[in-house]
Amino acid sequence: MTFAKPGDTAESLATRYLGDAGKGWMIEDYTGARTFEPGQEVVIPRRSWNPSGVEPGGYQIVPILCYHNLGPESKGRLLLAASKFEEQMRYLKANGYRVVSLSEFVEFTRLGRQLPHKAVVLTFDDGYKSFRQYAYPVLKELGFTATLFVYMDYVGAGRHALSWQDLRELSTEGFDVQAHSKTHGDLRRAPGETDAQYARRMQTELGQPQEMFRRNLGRPSPIVAYPYGSWDESLLSKLAE
């Protein structure tokens, strides 16, 4: 416990006592307040008190918002107008949502990390250059992060695709980059496909991205997004290997 100083907020107290302003949400969630009067008693939680997200009244739900391409106007299911995207991000900020990385969310599902009550995850599939043009400035302004799932055959494939240099720069800026297969094909086992055929195909679709991540980003990709969200037990077995 401590006593607030003039001008103290959850973020300033988190900086002082937890070494990270980004942990201000822990103080805010625990105390129910974001600002404090001078001399007010404030409890500083030193560690997570509920990493499971399960409470007497129910359990925590963390929305994952999946985006693909952004542009001047919306078109179809995968191209969203940049103005609409910015509107959605500002809505999240204004309504107290806190964006967490997908890696943090995975740790939460394993009971290893507590998340803010209004946590949300942002992902971008495929690796469109429009992320840098439209999403990046808005996310940086609002202090949000995001996870980009890129497939190898598209990286650096033209002026509409992110390059490895783009991905390296985004990684240093705090954005999470993960694999989305090599070709963006369906990774489920095809009818009539033999064990050997499927193993070879998965070595290409799953193994090559790991090699390319190590070569270009200096690390593997511990998280993989299935193209089209399609999966089966055969795919899970290969991923476990």
Each language-model region and where it sits:
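Extracellular LysM carbohydrate-binding repeats and other cell-envelope/extracellular binding modules
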Residues: 1-3, 12, 16-57
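A short beta-strand micro-motif
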Residues: 2-4, 65-66
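Metal-dependent polysaccharide deacetylase catalytic core of the NodB/CE4 family, i.e.
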Residues: 60-75, 95-98, 108-111, 116-120, ...
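Catalytic domains of carbohydrate-active enzymes, especially glycoside hydrolases
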Residues: 81-102
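Short, electropositive alpha-helical surface patch
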Residues: 231-241
